[in-house]
Amino acid sequence: MNDSGYQSNLSLLRVFLDEFRSVLRQESPGLIPRLAFYYVRAFLSLLCQYPNKKLASLPLYRWINLFIMCNVMTIFWTMFVALPESKNVIEMGDDLVWISGMALVFTKIFYMHLRCDEIDELISDFEYYNRELRPHNIDEEVLGWQRLCYVIESGLYINCFCLVNFFSAAIFLQPLLGEGKLPFHSVYPFQWHRLDLHPYTFWFLYIWQSLTSQHNLMSILMVDMVGISTFLQTALNLKLLCIEIRKLGDMEVSDKRFHEEFCRVVRFHQHIIKLVGKANRAFNGAFNAQLMASFSLISISTFETMAAAAVDPKMAAKFVLLMLVAFIQLSLWCVSGTLVYTQSVEVAQAAFDINDWHTKSPGIQRDISFVILRAQKPLMYVAEPFLPFTLGTYMLVLKNCYRLLALMQESM
């Protein structure tokens, strides 16, 4: 599991579909091959977007990673410089959407470059239940929840991978049907972006932007999947914690033995709390970028859809697609964040449901009461200094997008 070399990651991706199908074919819940985290990390490594200690020790890998980030920043600036050339509000909106998207891509891959070693530690921390608490678990309820989470995560990867490839094809094929433009409105030195003046250079740039777009979309998809898997695995661990707490009430043992088992479960709870704090620190920059980009992308694409509907239906359809992508992306973050929020407060109910806990010794009753009190403070993934990823934040973002949309309509 700890071997994260380039060849081992390639081998892991080769067996992904076989392992996924083997889990789907299980008639009763069994052990999962590995956490779905490892597939995403392997894909990021193959994209040269995961320079952890082991891969960064390879000079070629390190230089490729730096080249990729420089390439993204270069394309961002060519798009930014082209912004004054926009002829109307529709073209300007199109440029702003892509500039926002490219800024989001760069921010996320930059933070992945900085935090990949911390993410390795997080992935290892999520193995705590199987490694420390219950290394040889055969409980069908626990195995069933682990299997369900594995299937959801892996299925999400597969479906998002297909959707992103469709979106990528729409980006670089659409200009071919138009006026011979680059996939992104850009300005290059010596007017290399002009098909009539530099046809060979134009087609080189066209292919280069298309390949960069495909690589960027795959990269941001996998970075997002790391974050969403962090949310889902946290919710799963909290669910397993609730199961372990409730099972304590079924134990017919002495108070001393009960207290030993209870302390093991409490250590698991403390581990989850610390894990959420570590994840918030590791992903904070990416969380902030996600909230700001979601707000801008939803607002601009919705406004441009309405502005272009009567003038340019093709552009309107393009903005609808961009709006849906932004909605889906924000929805995934907020729904999975809400799972963590709701499951963390369920721990208090699980502790209260321990059978006959009021008949235990005063020390045990005090410890259980402390767990109930602590669990009433929900665990949240927060984009500090902004809001947590919950459905409440989702509705707040949509409400503010609507207000901004109304303001832009009035200004026209």
From Swiss-Prot:
Stretches assigned to the Extracellular side: 96-103, 191-229, 324-330, 411-412
Expression tissues: Expressed in olfactory sensory neurons in the antenna.
Keyword Transmembrane helix attributed: yes
Topology of the protein relative to the lipid bilayer: Multi-pass membrane protein
UniProt entry keywords in alphabetical sequence: Cell membrane, Membrane, Olfaction, Receptor, Sensory transduction, Transducer, Transmembrane, Transmembrane helix
Transmembrane stretches, start-end: 75-95, 104-124, 170-190, 230-250, 303-323, 331-351, 390-410
GO BP annotation list: detection of chemical stimulus involved in sensory perception of smell; response to pheromone; sensory perception of smell; signal transduction
Pfam families in alphabetical order: 7tm_6
Protein name: Odorant receptor 47b
Gene name of the record: Or47b
